[in-house]
């Protein structure tokens, strides 16, 4: 078993690391890991830290226990206009979390056991990969409880499973077992519950062996197809970052600092 080390301490999540892998766990098993604005704020903080940590190459998102990955927003704190935290301001800050997961230039893996329902289902959708236990259950509940996700939860879901299936998932609010999810391309693999973490770590370790720059650009390219100009901006930012590491870019910088004309003729013009 992996020996996870606590990276930071939070009230409603766990944030741990192990051999280049960060694991962020929603720690509210008593409510099937439903999230509050505080839960989401803590996840955003942990994801941002994992993004900035150069020792972390892959991030895992999980739920405490084996009964639920995440059951979505905690309906007990849902108020007028959003979910209400200690500051009494209604929020839908999970949208910020979804976007953060998409733009982090590292693979994010959903490790799903039990229920991935509602907003929890959308969280696994926006992750790059999903490893599911054989007890996993997937589905949307929005139209049953007066809610919906008209962003990644529907549009990107349709890219994954097709428009007809995505409409079925949302219009009927049925639940699907792990094998059904695998058959529709909603998850990457299904393993026995007792092997879930072991298999997830195996996938993470395989990715850690790959070029981090290649993975960064591949993620940006995959997302650019669905994220419009914001996706292109992310891809362009990654390209600029890579360009800054070249001798050609350094020549432009240094010539400005040295108040001389840059010598770009020394660099090849590839076809």
UniProtKB/Swiss-Prot annotation:
User: Which GO molecular function, any one, fits this protein according to its record?
Assistant: 1,4-dihydroxy-2-naphthoyl-CoA synthase activity
Q: Name one GO cellular component term.
A: cytosol
CDD domains per the UniProt record, alphabetical: crotonase-like
Which chemical reaction does it catalyze?
2-succinylbenzoyl-CoA + H(+) = 1,4-dihydroxy-2-naphthoyl-CoA + H2O
* Role of this protein: Converts o-succinylbenzoyl-CoA (OSB-CoA) to 1,4-dihydroxy-2-naphthoyl-CoA (DHNA-CoA).
Basic and acidic residues composition bias: which ranges? 250-263
Task: Detail which positions bind substrate.
Answer: 71-75, 83, 115-119, 141, 147, 244, 259
Q: In which pathway does it act?
A: Quinol/quinone metabolism; 1,4-dihydroxy-2-naphthoate biosynthesis; 1,4-dihydroxy-2-naphthoate from chorismate: step 6/7; Quinol/quinone metabolism; menaquinone biosynthesis
Enzyme Commission numbers on file: 4.1.3.36
Among the GO biological process terms of this entry, one is:
menaquinone biosynthetic process
- Kindly indicate where the leader peptide sits in this chain: none
Q: PROSITE patterns per the record?
A: ENOYL_COA_HYDRATASE
Which residues bind hydrogencarbonate per the record?
A: 140-142
Family stated for the protein in its record: Belongs to the enoyl-CoA hydratase/isomerase family. MenB subfamily.
Site annotation (Important for catalysis) points to 83, 244
InterPro entries membership: ClpP/crotonase-like_dom_sf, DHNA-CoA_synthase_MenB, Enoyl-CoA_hyd/isom_CS, Enoyl-CoA_hydra/iso, Enoyl-CoA_hydra_C
| Details of cofactor binding | The hydrogencarbonate anion plays the same catalytic role (proton acceptor) as the side-chain carboxylate group of the essential 'Asp-185' found in actinobacteria, archaea, bacteroidetes, and deltaproteobacteria.
Q: Keywords in UniProt for this one?
A: Lyase, Menaquinone biosynthesis
Residues folding into a coiled coil are: none
One Pfam family hit: ECH_1
Write the protein's name. 1,4-dihydroxy-2-naphthoyl-CoA synthase
Q: Which cofactor does it need?
A: hydrogencarbonate
């Amino acid at each position: 078993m992996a020996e996870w080390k606590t990276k930071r301490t939070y009230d409603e999540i766990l944030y741990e690391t192990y051999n280049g892998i960060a694991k962020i766990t929603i720690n509210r098993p008593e409510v099937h890991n439903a999230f509050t604005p505080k839960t989401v704020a803590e996840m955003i903080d942990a994801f941002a830290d994992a993004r900035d940590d150069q020792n972390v190459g892959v991030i895992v998102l999980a739920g405490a226990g084996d009964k639920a990955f995440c059951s979505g927003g905690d309906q007990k704190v849902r108020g007028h206009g959003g979910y209400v935290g200690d500051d009494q301001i209604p929020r839908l800050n999970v949208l910020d979390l979804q976007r953060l997961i998409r733009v982090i230039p590292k693979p994010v893996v959903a490790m799903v056991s039990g229920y991935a329902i509602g907003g929890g289902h959308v969280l696994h959708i926006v992750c790059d990969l999903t490893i599911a236990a054989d007890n996993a259950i997937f589905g949307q509940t929005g139209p049953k409880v007066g809610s919906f996700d008209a962003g990644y939860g529907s549009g990107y879901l349709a890219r994954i499973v097709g428009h007809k299936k995505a409409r079925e998932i949302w219009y009927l609010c049925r639940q699907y077992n792990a094998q059904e999810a695998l058959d529709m391309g909603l998850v990457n693999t299904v393993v026995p519950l007792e092997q879930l973490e072991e298999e997830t770590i195996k996938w993470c370790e395989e990715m850690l062996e790959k070029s981090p720059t290649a993975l960064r650009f591949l993620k940006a390219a995959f997302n650019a197809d669905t994220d419009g100009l914001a996706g292109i901006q992310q891809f362009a930012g990654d390209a600029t970052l890579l360009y800054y590491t070249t001798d050609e870019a350094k020549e432009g910088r240094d010539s400005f600092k040295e108040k001389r004309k840059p010598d770009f003729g020394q660099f090849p013009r590839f076809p």
